[in-house]
Structures are given as structure tokens and as C-alpha cells.
UniProtKB/Swiss-Prot annotation:
Subunit and partners: Homodimer which binds Holliday junction (HJ) DNA. The HJ becomes 2-fold symmetrical on binding to RuvC with unstacked arms; it has a different conformation from HJ DNA in complex with RuvA. In the full resolvosome a probable DNA-RuvA(4)-RuvB(12)-RuvC(2) complex forms which resolves the HJ.
Homology family: Belongs to the RuvC family.
Gene Ontology molecular function: any one: DNA binding
Name this polypeptide is given: Crossover junction endodeoxyribonuclease RuvC
PROSITE patterns (UniProt xref): RUVC (PS01321)
Species: Pelodictyon phaeoclathratiforme (strain DSM 5477 / BU-1)
GO BP: DNA recombination; DNA repair
Pfam families registered for this protein in UniProt: RuvC (PF02075)
Catalysed reactions, semicolon-separated: Endonucleolytic cleavage at a junction such as a reciprocal single-stranded crossover between two homologous DNA duplexes (Holliday junction)
Reported function: The RuvA-RuvB-RuvC complex processes Holliday junction (HJ) DNA during genetic recombination and DNA repair. Endonuclease that resolves HJ intermediates. Cleaves cruciform DNA by making single-stranded nicks across the HJ at symmetrical positions within the homologous arms, yielding a 5'-phosphate and a 3'-hydroxyl group; requires a central core of homology in the junction. The consensus cleavage sequence is 5'-(A/T)TT(C/G)-3'. Cleavage occurs on the 3'-side of the TT dinucleotide at the point of strand exchange.
InterPro entries associated with the record: RNaseH-like_sf, RNaseH_sf, X-over_junc_endoDNase_Mg_BS, X-over_junc_endoDNase_RuvC
Listed EC numbers: 3.1.21.10
Length: 191
């Protein structure tokens, strides 16, 4: 099984491709997509899409593992991160790849055994589990490798991404959620 882990960001996007054969893990590629600070957000999203598409072409992963959005006090940052995630999701769907999403605490727990682990602890354990010396930098790279490892260690146990209108087993789609919980929806354009 080959998994592409992605740590999405609007300035740096980390990626890591890991192959699992039995109990052995091999890093096929890892790195960071550095986005030019003067580029527009749309140009950055395009760059992320193109560079990850090249990684997918070169290494043919069967699955993309992606970190979910954590809640942020900065709405602009959360929106930009959501748009980057959308580009990664669109790429995975366009290439007919499985897509699994993991919360940051779930990734940390899978890699270190502690959901509140620091980035340094995650980097140390990722490097140790994958026999990487030196530890890849920046943390975006080890985070992406950790996301891929989480998926492999969990056996791809996450339910594949569902499109709008479909629900996960026992869950609900976004439209169902909005209908059932209107008070939870942020109204951007109120009269």
C-alpha cells in the first residue's frame, strides 16, 4: 500500500509518500511546497495542486491522507486553509484515489501514543519509526509523514471521503447537518 500524507498550509504544505510492505515502511518521497509570499492565494492553491499532482504521478499512491481543519480564532486563516484542503480533496477525487481524513490529535496519538504530543515529539517518533536520519525539516514534512503513517497504522480504517448529499455510516451530510443545526452555522451575510 502506498499513501500520500498531506499537511495542508497556505504558506508551507508538507507531503510524504510512504509504502508499506508487511510490517516495513519505506519513505518514497517527502518534502515541502514553499509558496511565494507575494503570490495571490489562488496562485498558491494552483501551485499546491500542480506539485502534488506531480508527486501522485511519480509515486502512484492508492490513498491520500489529509489532516482535518482545527478550529482557529482567525477566520481568514481557517478559510484559506479550507480552500487549500479543498484543492487537495479535488485532486484526490480527480485521480480516483481514496481519501482519508484524520484529526491532529488522532495523528499524534497514532504516532506517539499521546494525542497532545508536541511537534518535536511527533518529528522524533516519525524519524525513529521510518529510520530517517537526520529528522526531516520543517515540521510540515514530519507532520505529513505522520499523517501517512497514521493512515497505514490504522489500516486505512477511516471511511472514504463522501461527496455532498452522502453520509458516512451513522453520520450525516453537510446539508443534513445545516438543516438539523442551524444555530451552529456561522452567518456571514446577515441582514
Amino acid at each position: 500500500m502506498v499513501v500520500l500524507g498531506v499537511d495542508p498550509g497556505s504558506r508551507l504544505t508538507g507531503y510524504g509518500v510512504i509504502r508499506q510492505e508487511g510490517t516495513f515502511f519505506t519513505v518514497l518521497s517527502c518534502g515541502v511546497i514553499r509558496l511565494h509570499p507575494r503570490s495571490s492565494h489562488a496562485e498558491r492553491i494552483g501551485q499546491i495542486y500542480r506539485e502534488l499532482e506531480a508527486v501522485i504521478t511519480d509515486y502512484a499512491p492508492e490513498c491520500v491522507a489529509l489532516e482535518t481543519v482545527f478550529l482557529s480564532r482567525n477566520v481568514q486563516s481557517a478559510l484559506k486553509l479550507g480552500q487549500v484542503r479543498g484543492a487537495v480533496i479535488a485532486l484526490a477525487m480527480n485521480r480516483n484515489l481514496l481519501l482519508h481524513e484524520y484529526a491532529p490529535r488522532e495523528v499524534k496519538s497514532a504516532v506517539t501514543g499521546k494525542g497532545a504530543a508536541s511537534k518535536e515529539q511527533v518529528a522524533f517518533m516519525v524519524a525513529r519509526m521510518l529510520a530517517l536520519n537526520p529528522v526531516p525539516e520543517p515540521f510540515d514534512v514530519t507532520d505529513a509523514l505522520g499523517i501517512a503513517l497514521c493512515d497505514l497504522l490504522r489500516g486505512g480504517s477511516r471511511e472514504p471521503f463522501k461527496s455532498a448529499g452522502q453520509s458516512r455510516k451513522g453520520g450525516m451530510s453537510w446539508s443534513q447537518f445545516v438543516g438539523a443545526s442551524p444555530d451552529m452555522v456561522i452567518r456571514l451575510f446577515q441582514k
